[in-house]
Curated annotation (Swiss-Prot):
ATP binds at K247. Catalyzes the tRNA-independent activation of glutamate in presence of ATP and the subsequent transfer of glutamate onto a tRNA(Asp). Glutamate is transferred on the 2-amino-5-(4,5-dihydroxy-2-cyclopenten-1-yl) moiety of the queuosine in the wobble position of the QUC anticodon. A motif ('HIGH' region) lies at residues 32-42. L-glutamate binds at R29, F30, A31, P32, S33, D65, Y188, R206. A motif ('KMSKS' region) lies at residues 244-248. It comes from Prochlorococcus marinus (strain MIT 9313). This is Glutamyl-Q tRNA(Asp) synthetase. InterPro entries: aa-tRNA-synth_I_CS, Glu-Q_tRNA(Asp)_Synthase, Glu/Gln-tRNA-synth, Glu/Gln-tRNA-synth_Ib_cat-dom, GluQ/Sye, Rossmann-like_a/b/a_fold. It comes from the Bacteria.
Length: 306
């Protein structure tokens, strides 16, 4: 990897470590937030991500996205680990906690600012809500504050957010990406991209609800690295009303299924069937499902969307 002038030596070394890990073979990850019990949609993504890594004889990491402390729930980290163990989805190495990596996120943020790739933005959520997006499209920030050279510190009782000046190729797909929120929290996109690059993640398999995040993350990767990360997306599970499963809606997790007497093979079979990997009614462990898919080349990849 060619050394980037944007990065001081210690960050360049972190990127080199990530590249060496990536060169050793496939590295995937599952990255839940500890905001409540995992629902079946989360578990389906975990299963498909685990299968993709194991079919490639690769590593599968567990990362806990716990930066947004006010939303975290006591006991959620232990609960999600127990659920993965129960399903037979074992991860490699120690669990990675984003809350313990704030130093490296802030270092990358400072490096990008020193290179002039960031600017202060004082657009409020209300102002952005007034910007209408085309039907069926996510909002692309129009660059309102890009050339204003606004003050970086407190002004009228609030801090600005910090945005990345994206290159022209991303201006219409992601817009300028927030890397530090106005409340001082590191933004999701920055933490995620830094982790993918420094932990050596070669491919991310995640829910289709994060498809809109891909362009913002690719724009940030483009700003700090020459090595792209591959993103693939799992179709969402929906309830009877066609709504995607969500923690805030209280959709079913493993506790309710276990209370009905269902075992891991029932749940793994149902999750696999929901993605057309096996027929409905099949009962098999995660290991047995992996063995079956090894006999059916390309079946899992047909499920995943770019």
């Amino acid at each position: 990897m060619a050394k980037s002038s944007a990065l001081p030596d210690h960050l360049y070394e972190q990127m080199e470590v990530g590249q060496r890990l990536r060169n050793q073979g496939y590295r995937g990850r599952f990255a839940p937030s500890p905001t409540g019990p995992l629902h079946l949609g989360n578990l389906c993504t975990a299963l498909v991500s685990w299968l993709q890594a194991r079919l490639a004889n690769g590593a599968w990491l567990l990362r806990v996205d716990d930066l947004d402390q006010p939303r975290n729930r006591v006991g959620a980290v232990e609960s999600l680990q127990q659920d993965l163990h129960w399903l037979g989805l074992e991860w490699d190495g120690p669990v990675v906690f984003q809350s313990r990596r704030r130093g490296i996120y802030n270092s990358f943020l400072s490096a990008l600012r020193r290179q002039g790739k960031l600017y202060a933005c004082r657009c409020s959520r209300r102002m952005l809500a007034d910007i209408s997006a085309p039907a069926g499209r996510h909002l692309v920030y129009p660059g309102t504050c890009r050339d204003l050279e606004l003050f970086w510190g407190w002004h009228e009782g609030r801090l600005p957010s910090w945005r990345l000046r994206v290159s022209k190729e991303f201006s219409h797909t992601s817009g300028d990406v927030i890397l530090r929120r106005a409340d001082g929290f590191i933004a999701y996109h920055l933490a995620t991209v830094v982790d993918e690059l420094t932990l050596g993640i070669s491919e991310v398999v995640r829910g289709e609800d994060l498809l809109d995040a891909m362009n913002a993350q690719l724009a940030l990767i483009n700003a700090i690295s020459e090595r792209p990360v591959i993103y693939r997306h799992v179709p969402l599970l929906c309830d009877d009303q066609g709504r995607k499963l969500a923690k805030r809606e209280g959709h079913a997790g493993l506790d309710s299924l276990r209370s009905e007497g269902l075992g891991p093979s029932h749940v793994v079979g149902w999750l696999a069937a929901s993605q057309s990997l096996v027929p409905f009614g099949a009962e098999l462990t995660a290991g047995e499902l992996l063995s079956e898919l090894k006999k059916k080349e390309g079946v899992l990849k047909s499920v995943l969307k770019p």
